[in-house]
C-alpha cells in the first residue's frame, strides 16, 4: 500500500499541471478505430528496415494497443498471438518445437529477470518475435526465433497516464508514467512507476512487483541519444514454484492450488539496468546505430524442491512428496554492446544494401547454494514429507535444518560476433546472403571451455504482385551451452549445439491491406541439445544434472492472419503445426524418450485468436481471445493433456478516462500449461480471475 501512496503523491502535481490540456483530449474510440489497430510495420528485430513483403524473415509484433486491450501484465499473456509459441516454464517458451529462454531488450542481451521470473510489460512499448534463424543477426540462440522487448522511450509531446487496479486473489496496484519536453532545448524525459500485489493461485504464494523507470532523449548535432535506467524489485513468497504431480495420463493427483513450498519460502529478485543508445542518418544512404547496456541483479531463492513421490498406504496411488530444501543466491552482472551500419548503394545498376555489425556480451555469475534432503520419516533437522491431499506446513522449522556451508560457484561467459548481410534487388527478386563469425569462452571454477564458428544464411523473395510475395531461406545455427551447464556438477562440459534450417513461405496484404496473412513451412535439425536428467540431482551435490541428446528434427507449418473485418471489428489469429522428434539417440538411456519419440513440451497443433468489436457511439469495445494447445509429452514422458482456454475484455472509454474489465480463463478450465519431470509434476494453468483497471490520460 505504501508504494501506491507514493505513486499517487507523485502524480498530484502532474494532474493539476495538466488541467489546461484537458480540452485537447479527444475520444480514443472513434469510427474506424479498429482498422490498423494491431498493425505495426516498424520492427527493430530485423536490424535491416524492410517492408514485410520484401523480407525473407517473419517478424510478429505485439504492439501497445494489443497489450492494453488484453490487459497484459507479463509476457505469458501474449503467447497466443504468436504462431508456434507456447509456454514451457517460467520465462521459457517452446518455439517451433525447441525450448527457448534467452530474450533481448532493444536488440541487446541483458535479461534482468534471470530466467526464473517472467518479464513484465509496464515499461515495454511492444514485443517483437523474430522467427527462424535470428542467430545471423543476434548471435548464438535457438533457431525457432527470439523475443525482443522494445522499451518505452521519452517523447517531445507531453502525455501522462495514471492507473489503479483491483481484482480477485486480493489483487491491487497502481501505476503512473509521464513524458514530455524538458526546459533544456532538445531534451525530453520520461518517468514511470508500477506497483502491484496479489495472491497467486497456489497455496502460500503471493506476488509483489515494483518497477521504477526513467529516461532522457537528447537531440544531438548528429543523431539522437537515449539514456535509460530501470529498477526491478520482485518479491514472490511461497516460491520458487514447481508443478503439481500427475499420473501418466496427465491427470493432477491433487488440487491445482497445491504447493510444495512452506509459507516462509520465497524468491526475491532485485535488478537494475542502465542503457544508452545512439542512432543517426548520414545523408540518404548511410544509417548508423550503437548501444550499450549494463545489468546487475541479485536473486535469492529459499524453497522446498519436490524430491520424489511415495505411496505411503500401499493403495497404488502416490499420496506424499519428499522434499529437499534449497538455499540459493545468484549474484549476476553483465555488459552488452552492439553497433550496426547500413549502406544503401547501386552496384553495377543493382539496387543494393549492406548491413555490417558487431556485438559483444560478457556475464559474471556468483552462485552460492546449499541444501538438505528430507526423508519419509519426520526429522527435526530436515524437511518433512508433504501430503498431496492434506498438506500440513510448518512441522519442522527451517531454522532447525542441519544445513551445510554454502558452496560457491563462479562462472564467466564471454561472447563476441561480427556479421555482414548483403541485399540485392533485381526487378521483383530480392536476394540476401550473410555470414557471421562467433566466438565464446566460458570459465567455471578451474574449468575453461571456448570455441568459435562461422555460420551462413541466405534468402530469396519474389514479389508475385504488389500485395503478394513468396520467400525462402536457409541458415546454419551455432549455440554454445550456458556457462552453468558446463560445470561437472551438472555432468558437463558439453559441446555446442549446431543445426541447419530451411524455410519457405508466402506473405500477403490483400484488400488494400485490410487482410494481412502469412504462411510458412520449415525443417530444422539440431544436434547435442541439453535436457534435464529426470533423476534430478544424481550426485547429491545440490545441482540438477543434464543430459545431451543426439539429433532432434523439427518440421512444421505456421499461419498468421490480421484482418479488419469491418471498420469496427478486428481479428488476429494464428495456427501452427509442429512435429519435433528425436531422430538419433546418443546412446544414453537415462531419459525415457527414444528415437522417434516426440520432444518434450512440443505440441503438434496450437491455435490462438483475439477479436475485438467496438461500439463507437457508446465508447465501448468488447474482446474475446482463445488459446488451444495440443497434447504434449513431459520430460519424463508423461502425457500433458490438451487444453482450450478463453479470455475476455470489456473496454469503456469516456474522454480521458478508460475502464478495462479483464476475465482470464473464462470457463475456469483445469489444465496443465506445460509438463516438466514426474517428481515435480506439470505446471498448472491459472484458474479464473477478474480484475478492473481504471486509468486517466493527459
Identify the residue ranges that each predicted region occupies.
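Face-selective signature of the C-terminal outer-membrane beta-barrel domain
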Residues: 274-297, 324-446
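C-terminal beta-signal and adjacent terminal beta-strands/loops
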Residues: 627-633, 651-698
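Structural signature of Gram-negative outer-membrane beta-barrels, strongest in the C-terminal barrel
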Residues: 219, 332, 351-363, 370, ...
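Transmembrane beta-barrel wall of Gram-negative outer-membrane proteins
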Residues: 159-161, 166-239, 264-281
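Acidic, small-polar-rich N-terminal luminal/periplasmic segments of exported/outer-membrane proteins
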Residues: 25-157, 504
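Membrane-embedded beta-barrel scaffold of Gram-negative outer-membrane proteins
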Residues: 277-293, 297-305, 470, 497-586
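Repeated loop/turn-to-beta-strand initiation elements of outer-membrane beta-barrel proteins
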Residues: 186-189, 222-227, 285-288, 349, ...
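Gram-negative outer-membrane beta-barrel transporters
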Residues: 428, 547-635, 670, 693-697
Amino acid at each position: 500500500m505504501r508504494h501506491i501512496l507514493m505513486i499517487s503523491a507523485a502524480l498530484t502535481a502532474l494532474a493539476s499541471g495538466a488541467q489546461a490540456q484537458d480540452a485537447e483530449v479527444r475520444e480514443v474510440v472513434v469510427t474506424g478505430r479498429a482498422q490498423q489497430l494491431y498493425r505495426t510495420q516498424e520492427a527493430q528485430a530485423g536490424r535491416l528496415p524492410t517492408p514485410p513483403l520484401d523480407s525473407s524473415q517473419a517478424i510478429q509484433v505485439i504492439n501497445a494497443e494489443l497489450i492494453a486491450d488484453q490487459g497484459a501484465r507479463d509476457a505469458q499473456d501474449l503467447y497466443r498471438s504468436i504462431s508456434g509459441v507456447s509456454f514451457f516454464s517460467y520465462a521459457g517458451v517452446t518455439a517451433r518445437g525447441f525450448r527457448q529462454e534467452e530474450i533481448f531488450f532493444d536488440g541487446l542481451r541483458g535479461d534482468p529477470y534471470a530466467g526464473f521470473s517472467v518479464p513484465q510489460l509496464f515499461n515495454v512499448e511492444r514485443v517483437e518475435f523474430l522467427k527462424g534463424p535470428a542467430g545471423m543477426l543476434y548471435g548464438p540462440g535457438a533457431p525457432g526465433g527470439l523475443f525482443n522487448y522494445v522499451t518505452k522511450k521519452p517523447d517531445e509531446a507531453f502525455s501522462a497516464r495514471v492507473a489503479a487496479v483491483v481484482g480477485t486473489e486480493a489483487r491491487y496496484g497502481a501505476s503512473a508514467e509521464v513524458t514530455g519536453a524538458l526546459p533544456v532545448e532538445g531534451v525530453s524525459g520520461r518517468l514511470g512507476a508500477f506497483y502491484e500485489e496479489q495472491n497467486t493461485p497456489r497455496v502460500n504464494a503471493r506476488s509483489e512487483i515494483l518497477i521504477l523507470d526513467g529516461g532522457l532523449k537528447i537531440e544531438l548535432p548528429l543523431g539522437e541519444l537515449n539514456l535509460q535506467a530501470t529498477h526491478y524489485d520482485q518479491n514472490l513468497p511461497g516460491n520458487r514454484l514447481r508443478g503439481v504431480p500427475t499420473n501418466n495420463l496427465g491427470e493432477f493427483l491433487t488440487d491445482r492450488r497445491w504447493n510444495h513450498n512452506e509459507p516462509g519460502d520465497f524468491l526475491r529478485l532485485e535488478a537494475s539496468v542502465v542503457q544508452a543508445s545512439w542512432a543517426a542518418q548520414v545523408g540518404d544512404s548511410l544509417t548508423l546505430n550503437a548501444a550499450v547496456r549494463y545489468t546487475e541483479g541479485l536473486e535469492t531463492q529459499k524453497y522446498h524442491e519436490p524430491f520424489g513421490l511415495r505411496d505411503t498406504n500401499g493403495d497404488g496411488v502416490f499420496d506424499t512428496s519428499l522434499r529437499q530444501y534449497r538455499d540459493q543466491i545468484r549474484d549476476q552482472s553483465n555488459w552488452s554492446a552492439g553497433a550496426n551500419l547500413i549502406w544503401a548503394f547501386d552496384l553495377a545498376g543493382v539496387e543494393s544494401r549492406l548491413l555490417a555489425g558487431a556485438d559483444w556480451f560478457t556475464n559474471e555469475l556468483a552462485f552460492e547454494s546449499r541444501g538438505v534432503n528430507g526423508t519419509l520419516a519426520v526429522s527435526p533437522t530436515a524437511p518433512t514429507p508433504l501430503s498431496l491431499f492434506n498438506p500440513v506446513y510448518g512441522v519442522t522449522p527451517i531454522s532447525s535444518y542441519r544445513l551445510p556451508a554454502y558452496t560457491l560457484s563462479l562462472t564467466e561467459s564471454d561472447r563476441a560476433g561480427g556479421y555482414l548481410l548483403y541485399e540485392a534487388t533485381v526487378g521483383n527478386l530480392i536476394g540476401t546472403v550473410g555470414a557471421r563469425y562467433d566466438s565464446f569462452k566460458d570459465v567455471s571454477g578451474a574449468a575453461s571451455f571456448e570455441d568459435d564458428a562461422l555460420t551462413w544464411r541466405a534468402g530469396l523473395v519474389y514479389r508475385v504482385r504488389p500485395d503478394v510475395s513468396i520467400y525462402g531461406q536457409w541458415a546454419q545455427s551455432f549455440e554454445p551451452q550456458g556457462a552453468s551447464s558446463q560445470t561437472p556438477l551438472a555432468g558437463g562440459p558439453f559441446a555446442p549445439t549446431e543445426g541447419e534450417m530451411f524455410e519457405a513461405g508466402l506473405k500477403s496484404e490483400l484488400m488494400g491491406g485490410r487482410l494481412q496473412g502469412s504462411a510458412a513451412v520449415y525443417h530444422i535439425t539440431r544436434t547435442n541439445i541439453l535436457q534435464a536428467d529426470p533423476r534430478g540431482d544424481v550426485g547429491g551435490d545440490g545441482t540438477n544434472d543434464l543430459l545431451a541428446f543426439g539429433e532432434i528434427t523439427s518440421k512444421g507449418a505456421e499461419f498468421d492472419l490480421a484482418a479488419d473485418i469491418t471498420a469496427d471489428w478486428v481479428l488476429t489469429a494464428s495456427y501452427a503445426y509442429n512435429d519435433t522428434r528425436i531422430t538419433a539417440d546418443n546412446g544414453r538411456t537415462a531419459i525415457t524418450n527414444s528415437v522417434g519419440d516426440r520432444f518434450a513440451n512440443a505440441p503438434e497443433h496450437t491455435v490462438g485468436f483475439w477479436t475485438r468489436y467496438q461500439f463507437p457511439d457508446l465508447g465501448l469495445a468488447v474482446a474475446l481471445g482463445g488459446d488451444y494447445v495440443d497434447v504434449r509429452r513431459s520430460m519424463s514422458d508423461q502425457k500433458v493433456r490438451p487444453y482450450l482456454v478463453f479470455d475476455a475484455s470489456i473496454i469503456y472509454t469516456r474522454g480521458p478516462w478508460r475502464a478495462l474489465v479483464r476475465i482470464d480463463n473464462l470457463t475456469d478450465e483445469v489444465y496443465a500449461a506445460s509438463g516438466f519431470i514426474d517428481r515435480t509434476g506439470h505446471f498448472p494453468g491459472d484458474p479464473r480471475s477478474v480484475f478492473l483497471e481504471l486509468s486517466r490520460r493527459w
